[in-house]
Amino acid sequence: FILKVYKKDQRYLLIKNTKFNFLKNLSIFPMKELSNPKNFNENLNFKMSNMNMNIKIQYSKDSQKFPFSYWLDKKKLNSYMLPSFTKKVVQYLEEN
């Protein structure tokens, strides 16, 4: 998977997941699944249910218009109802 990170000030762009069967209708970072990755150096590796997710993080400057999107303030992370997947990604981004 390619995970696209859009950051403005101290906020991250999240979208409502309507694309993937996992974490359906929950807030995640914009992602794209790669069918046959070549030379893929992952940043993160998650195990979710019966799925192994290798994730490459891609930082983007220009924020596109995404349907059902909002900006998450990292300082108020605990006040949002988010899947642990999204929280782990934010934690990784803050540490690296």
What are these regions (language model features)?
Residues 1-96:
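Intrinsically disordered, low-complexity, charged terminal extensions of DNA damage-control enzymes
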